[in-house]
Swiss-Prot record:
Regulation of catalytic or functional activity: Inhibited by penicillin sulfones. Only weakly inhibited by clavulanic acid and sulbactam.
Residues annotated as catalytic: S71
Any one Pfam family match given in the protein's UniProt record, by short name: Transpeptidase
Keywords: Antibiotic resistance, Hydrolase, Periplasm, Plasmid, Signal, Transposable element
Identification of the protein by name: Beta-lactamase OXA-1
UniProt subunit comment: Monomer.
Cleavable signal peptide: 1-25
Main location: periplasm
A cellular component term, taken from the record's GO annotations: periplasmic space
PTM annotation (N6-carboxylysine): residues: K74
GO biological process: antibiotic catabolic process; response to antibiotic
PROSITE patterns: BETA_LACTAMASE_D
Length: 276
């Protein structure tokens, strides 16, 4: 209880600094973020979507480091699929009755539940329908990380695993700019592709009724000793002001893949207390 009070008071001080400071420089939220990301190498970024002003940041070095996007790649893939008219909001992805690794994946899915439950087999079905060349073109148009969709060396698995702790890498800073392009409708895709993707990312209202849109991602590194975790997306205030954020981490969190849960929890804690 005392720790919670201390963290909330520290965040209150940071909010006061953000509101009343006449400077436009970003606020370092280390006092708040350090205990939240304890035991991991974490990063948090919050930007004004319109002006590209950095509102708050934690651990700039980590935020500049590329890592596999894991299931956050579904955001980019959703844009591609809707733009190429491979899917629409009424699409049903039919389960083939074979076990898919998680119980929630063993059923038919929609574009919304594909995003909500991070259904890998749906992503793999979509990538194969779009095709490697077209995906590469989209990655270039999106300026998405290192744009490497080759997959693991000598495994020829780019279309099915490039984003899953494999060849495709992107930094939290690069994710921020990608998210800004989405929320500002500044990508060379159909407006409907952007609108449908954003709609399917909606999760909940924050404590102050600000709307939260987001996507998690998680994966074990090659030696399975560390986990990468993501939570990223948009918040839209009651007044309509838009922000983009990324929470990311790398750490030894045991054998259960919980890194994205931690990244999401940390982000929501910070966003709720910032009360934007």
């Amino acid at each position: 209880m005392k720790n919670t009070i201390h963290i909330n008071f520290a965040i209150f001080l940071i909010i006061a600094n953000i509101i009343y400071s006449s400077a436009s420089a970003s606020t370092d939220i280390s006092t708040v973020a350090s205990p939240l990301f304890e035991g991991t190498e974490g990063c948090f970024l919050l930007y004004d979507a319109s002006t590209n002003a950095e509102i708050a940041q934690f651990n700039k070095a980590k935020c500049a480091t590329q890592m596999a996007p894991d299931s956050t790649f579904k955001i980019a893939l959703s844009l591609m699929a809707f733009d190429a008219e491979i899917i629409d909001q009424k699409t049903i992805f039919k389960w083939d009755k074979t076990p898919k690794g998680m119980e929630i994946w063993n059923s038919n899915h929609t574009p919304k539940t594909w995003m909500q439950f991070s259904v890998v087999w749906v992503s793999q079905e979509i990538t194969q329908k779009i095709g490697l060349n077209k995906i590469k073109n989209y990655l270039k148009d999106f300026d998405y990380g290192n744009q490497d969709f080759s997959g693991d060396k000598e495994r020829n698995n780019g279309l099915t695993e490039a984003w899953l702790e494999s060849s495709l890498k992107i930094s939290p800073e690069e994710q921020i700019q990608f998210l800004r392009k989405i929320i500002n409708h500044n990508l060379p895709v159909k407006n409907s592709a952007i609108e449908n993707t954003i709609e399917n990312m909606y999760l909940q209202d924050l404590d102050n009724s600000t709307k939260l849109y987001g996507k998690t991602g998680a994966g074990f590194t090659a030696n399975r000793t560390l986990q990468n975790g993501w939570f990223e997306g948009f918040i839209i205030s009651k007044s309509g002001h838009k922000y983009v954020f990324v929470s990311a981490l790398t750490g030894n969190l045991g054998s259960n893949l919980t890194s994205s849960i931690k990244a999401k929890k940390n982000a929501i804690t910070i966003l709720n207390t910032l009360n934007l």
